[in-house]
């Protein structure tokens, strides 16, 4: 916090530079409270677009300040308050969200859904959160971890060994990864592969029983449709959604088979790792996790459930560090990320990936 506080003081005094900007960005993730002592100054930083602040910074906005900002937006008659509106939208407070949303729709260049998903909420006059706040990080099995490190430089191995997202915390749930399922892909008709089998409560608080998330690694992202949907039975097992079944199977490129492993889902004590940025991580942090906020590679997007049409909450992401049985790595395109979503009402999962 001392380094962050000094950087914040120097930035407010008018000093600029790449190193200072980097410290400010990391501070917004590691010590957001340091930046929350002067909201107007923080808003000025956001309006410059030079510092990419974590969205969580604005979630601490006091209700009185939020109400004052909402009044400013309500009285504005031009687009000069875009930064204020974006910050108020990210705060996602029920009393002021609609005003921020209305201003952005009126004066911004993006539609309402884009703004809502950027804030992690469903499109509508009131915010409905589409992700949780307490992620569980994957604690990979011994053979998985050995394969993950095989071709990495020594400095990265050392970083992973010491980094809390790789080796910290306490296991809350056990799980399994890898291996074929009985269900077949609707596109290529090959068996789905097990992404994760664990207790349903890990994905949906209060749920009972188990859930198995499965996917065709060969078709997802390479063959239409871009989002793969699966219905889950009473035992939590997936089957291809009927609308995505092809009578004539496709012949996609073989992406390999996930290595079988017993894994743990770990809760970290520090609030620092509730939000993680994909670019900031730069392959140093473990970004594979269940719950919490997504680490988007591209733009934020929560798909609509194929059955009920409502935007689906985010439940899991898997980084491109997953070893396959053929001594390869699943890259999700090219160093990308797989995102998984869950509609509890319909018991439908959806999956897609993004890459650079």
Q: Residue spans of the language-model regions?
A:
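Preference for intrinsically disordered or flexible, low-complexity segments
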Residues: 1-356
């Amino acid at each position: 916090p001392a380094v962050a506080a000094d950087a914040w003081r120097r930035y407010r005094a008018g000093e600029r530079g790449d190193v200072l900007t980097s410290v400010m960005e990391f501070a917004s993730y590691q010590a957001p409270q340091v930046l929350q002592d002067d909201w107007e100054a923080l808003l000025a930083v956001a309006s410059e677009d030079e510092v990419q602040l974590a969205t969580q910074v604005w979630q601490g906005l006091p209700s009185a300040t939020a109400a004052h900002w909402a009044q400013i937006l309500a009285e504005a008659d031009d687009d000069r308050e875009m930064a204020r509106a974006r910050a108020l939208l990210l705060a996602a407070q029920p009393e002021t969200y609609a005003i921020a949303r209305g201003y952005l729709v009126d004066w911004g260049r993006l539609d309402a859904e884009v703004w809502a998903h950027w804030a992690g909420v469903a499109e509508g006059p009131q915010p409905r959160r589409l992700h949780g706040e307490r992620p569980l990080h994957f604690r990979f099995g011994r053979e998985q971890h050995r394969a993950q490190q095989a071709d990495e430089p020594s400095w990265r191995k050392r970083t992973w060994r010491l980094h809390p997202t790789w080796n910290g915390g306490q296991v809350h749930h056990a799980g399994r990864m890898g291996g074929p399922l009985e269900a077949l892909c609707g596109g290529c008709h090959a068996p789905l592969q097990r992404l994760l089998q664990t207790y349903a409560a890990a994905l949906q608080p209060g749920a009972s029983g188990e859930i198995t998330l499965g996917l065709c690694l060969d078709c997802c992202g390479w063959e239409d449709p871009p989002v793969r949907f699966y219905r889950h039975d009473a035992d939590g097992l997936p089957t291809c959604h009927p609308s995505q079944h092809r009578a004539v199977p496709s012949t996609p490129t073989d992406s390999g088979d996930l290595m079988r492993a017993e894994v743990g889902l770990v809760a970290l004590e520090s609030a620092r790792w509730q939000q993680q940025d994909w670019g900031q991580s730069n392959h140093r942090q473990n970004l594979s996790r269940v719950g919490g906020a997504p680490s988007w590679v591209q733009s934020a997007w929560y798909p609509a459930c194929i059955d009920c049409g409502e935007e689906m909450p985010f439940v899991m992401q898997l980084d491109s560090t997953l070893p396959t049985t053929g001594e390869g790595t699943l890259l999700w395109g090219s160093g990308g990320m797989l995102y998984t979503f869950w509609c509890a009402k319909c018991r439908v999962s959806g999956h897609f990936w993004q890459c650079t």
